[in-house]
Amino acid sequence: MPGNAGTEQTTTVIIGTGLSGLAVAAELCRRGVDSIVVDGLDILGASHPANTASLQRCDAADSDTLRERNEILRHLRNYAASHDVDIRNTTRAVQLTMVDGLALGGGLATPARPQWEVRTPTGILVADNIVLTRCAHSQLRRMINDFGIAVGRNLTAAMRAIGIYLVGVGELITPSPKEVLRQAKTVGQAISAKVNPDSGPYPATGSFAALPC
């Protein structure tokens, strides 16, 4: 790939630099889990572009909720800046590929615990976990089918089984800001438990812990 800057390894790649992406990045940072946040995903699965324009915003007509959302965003951006969270606002993912971790030379992954290659215009990000934000359920189901995995009724469980987590994703409308924070906390706990299975929960300290849930 022209201009490829090489391959980077991280625990989690978060796709989306909005409220959902920043919330889960801050939660992971608070728990000592590294992540890289990219702006979005231009290709979803093998051949389906990510299209979130059809999703309605639940707060579009609610000025109080919009103010709350903006205040939380401001807080999250300040947290990210002060804690050196790796946010790449001008970088978009152009391909998402599930790979056998053993093929990458790490020797840690198993067929039941694949790794992910996230291609960007400047290189490849290799991660154990992917967090998706603002994608329609129908697109997510197509993506899982493209990977040859039976979805069944529980989309979230099917995706978590292969290391993909959802934050801020709704069927018809986007969740409220407080619901996004709740989802981010749940996903942060799940990923942290995979990374540090023998450690106890991190204490809810720091300014991010004071955000409403």
Feature annotation, model-predicted:
Residues 2-20:
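Beta1/beta-strand and adjacent pyrophosphate-binding region of the FAD-binding site
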Residues 24, 47, 99, 141-144, ...:
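Short glycine-/acidic-enriched loop or helix-start segments at secondary-structure transitions
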Residues 89-114:
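A conserved short coil-to-beta-strand element within the FAD-binding core of flavoproteins
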Residues 14-72:
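Beta1-alpha1 glycine-rich phosphate/pyrophosphate-binding loop at the start
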Residues 143, 147-155, 160-213:
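C-terminal, flexible cofactor-proximal segment of oxidoreductases
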Residues 13-15, 117-118, 123-138:
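Short hydrophobic core segments
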Residues 36, 86-88, 165:
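General small-molecule cofactor/ligand-binding pocket signal
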Residues 69-88, 181, 188-190:
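Helical element adjacent to the flavin cofactor pocket in flavoenzyme catalytic cores
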